[in-house]
């Protein structure tokens, strides 16, 4: 079985590099590579109609979508989230 290509947008990659505890995020990215069918904790369509998935990992939210025709998952953003 071929792994899916996971593309990480440059500003998401910059945020990932700055994280002190990035192991959970990297583990999730690796899971997306081997299983692109993973869905997030929340989802919402963007203006183009793509379903944007939001996965919460501790204090981080990963925004991504799957393009099944290109066999790619694009990570659009990694954001800090605060409990509140």
Q: Where are the language model's segments positioned?
A:
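Arg/Lys-rich, positively charged N-terminal/basic patches that mediate binding to nucleic acids
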Residues: 1-30
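Intrinsically disordered, low-complexity regions enriched in small/polar residues
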Residues: 9, 30, 44, 66-67
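Amphipathic alpha-helical interaction segments
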Residues: 15, 36, 50, 72-74
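Enriched for short, Lys/Arg-rich terminal
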Residues: 1-7, 54-84
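A generic "cationic amphipathic patch" detector
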Residues: 25, 45, 76-77
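Low-complexity, intrinsically disordered/propeptide-like segments
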Residues: 19-22, 35, 66
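A short, surface-exposed loop/turn module that caps and links secondary-structure elements
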Residues: 30-56
């Amino acid at each position: 079985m071929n792994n899916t290509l996971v593309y990480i947008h440059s500003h998401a990659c910059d945020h990932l590099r700055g994280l002190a505890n990035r192991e959970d995020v990297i583990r999730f990215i690796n899971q997306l590579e081997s299983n692109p069918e993973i869905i997030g904790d929340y989802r919402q369509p963007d203006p183009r109609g793509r379903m944007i998935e939001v996965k919460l990992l501790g204090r981080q939210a990963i925004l991504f979508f799957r393009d099944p025709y290109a066999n790619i998952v694009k990570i659009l953003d990694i954001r800090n989230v605060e409990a509140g």
